[in-house]
C-alpha cells in the first residue's frame, strides 16, 4: 500500500463558518456519521477531534477541539479531510469503494483491453463506470448483465459489452 492509499479522502474544507473557528466541509463519503462529534479525522494529515457537528444540505459544519478561533480555522481552508485506510468500514461482498475501482483495467470477455476506469458516476438506477476507450470514453453501466467480474487483486474489470456500448 502506498502512502497515498494509506489515507482515504472523505471531504474538503470549503472555508470558515462563524467567528469561533467552525469549518464548512464538502462531504465526499457515503458514511456521513464519520463527521459525528467525538470522531477523529485528518485535515492536512494532522489529527483533529470533532467537538460539534451541524448539517447544511450536503455540507457539514464541524467544530474541532483543537481549533478555537477563526485565524487557526482559516489556515485549514481548502485542505483535504481524510481518514486512515485502516478506519474504512468493511463493505459487503461485491460492493466496492470508488477509490478501489478507479484505475482498474477494463477488458472484454476475450481479454481485449478496452481502457481504464477514470471516474464513477452515481446515478439513481445504477452506477456508471467512465472508462478511457482510445481517444474517447466508454460509459459502462455497472449492472450484472454488463460487468461480469471485478478482480481487485488483478486490477481488472471484465465486461460483456452490450451492442452499441463501444461504438
Swiss-Prot record:
Oligomer and partners: Binds ribosomal protein uS19.
Homology family: Belongs to the RimM family.
Species lineage: Bacteria, Bacillati, Chloroflexota, Dehalococcoidia, Dehalococcoidales
Ranges of residues in domain PRC barrel: 93-165
Protein name: Ribosome maturation factor RimM
UniProtKB keywords: Chaperone, Cytoplasm, Ribosome biogenesis, rRNA processing
Function, as annotated: An accessory protein needed during the final step in the assembly of 30S ribosomal subunit, possibly for assembly of the head region. Essential for efficient processing of 16S rRNA. May be needed both before and after RbfA during the maturation of 16S rRNA. It has affinity for free ribosomal 30S subunits but not for 70S ribosomes.
Single Gene Ontology BP annotation: rRNA processing
Cellular location(s): Cytoplasm
GO MF term list: ribosome binding
PROSITE patterns reported for this sequence: LRR (PS51450)
Domain notes: The PRC barrel domain binds ribosomal protein uS19.
GO cellular component, one term: cytoplasm
Domain of life per record: Bacteria
Principal location: cytoplasm
Database matches in NCBIfam families: 16S_RimM
Gene giving rise to this polypeptide: rimM
SUPFAM superfamilies membership: PRC-barrel domain, Translation proteins
Keyword Chaperone among record annotations: yes
